[in-house]
């Protein structure tokens, strides 16, 4: 998904500095911070996802933080869950037994590249259509004004 940034930048290049975009981004980040504190169990999912990503990437060691650590001193339950997360991924998902856990990632990259090519073709078509519609609109405007 290395091309995701290219797609995102191209899609939002005109909107990134708009006032509405900045306000919505700030509100979204504030909600994320508040909701993390209101529901610390979501951090358990985040920790599992991070541990899985690290294992797939081939990390030598993985340390998962207790899910309630950002809001309070961790409990014995949260420490046990954090300790067992990597063990569960290793023993039950057999991530340590595979040679290349991300072996099929080339296909996702290929599909992403195809999406980018199709998106740029559509953008080029829309830009050419917009140029023609601008010319037609200008002509109609000039005709309506009697020029």
From Swiss-Prot:
Q: Name one GO molecular function term.
A: methylmalonyl-CoA mutase activity
Picking any one GO biological process from the record gives: propionate metabolic process, methylmalonyl pathway
Per the record, GO CC terms?
Answer: cytoplasm
Query: Matching InterPro entries, A to Z?
Result: Cbl-dep_enz_cat (IPR016176), MeMalonylCoA_mutase_a/b_cat (IPR006099)
Q: Which family does it belong to?
A: To methylmalonyl-CoA mutase.
Report the protein name in the record.
Methylmalonyl-CoA mutase homolog
Q: What is the lineage of its organism?
A: Bacteria, Bacillati, Bacillota, Bacilli, Bacillales
């Amino acid at each position: 998904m290395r091309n995701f940034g290219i797609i995102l930048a191209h899609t939002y290049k005109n909107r990134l500095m708009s006032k509405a975009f900045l306000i919505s981004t700030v509100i979204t980040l504030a909600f994320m911070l508040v909701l993390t504190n209101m529901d610390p169990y979501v951090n358990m999912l985040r920790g599992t996802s991070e541990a899985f990503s690290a294992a797939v990437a081939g990390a030598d060691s993985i340390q998962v933080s207790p899910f309630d650590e950002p809001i309070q001193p961790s409990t014995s339950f949260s420490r046990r869950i954090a300790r067992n997360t990597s063990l569960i991924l290793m023993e039950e998902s057999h991530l340590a037994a595979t040679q290349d856990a991300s072996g099929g990632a080339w296909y996702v990259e290929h599909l992403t590249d195809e999406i980018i090519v199709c998106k740029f073709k559509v953008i080029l078509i829309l830009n050419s259509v917009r140029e023609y519609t601008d010319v037609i609109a200008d002509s109609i405007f000039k005709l309506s004004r009697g020029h």
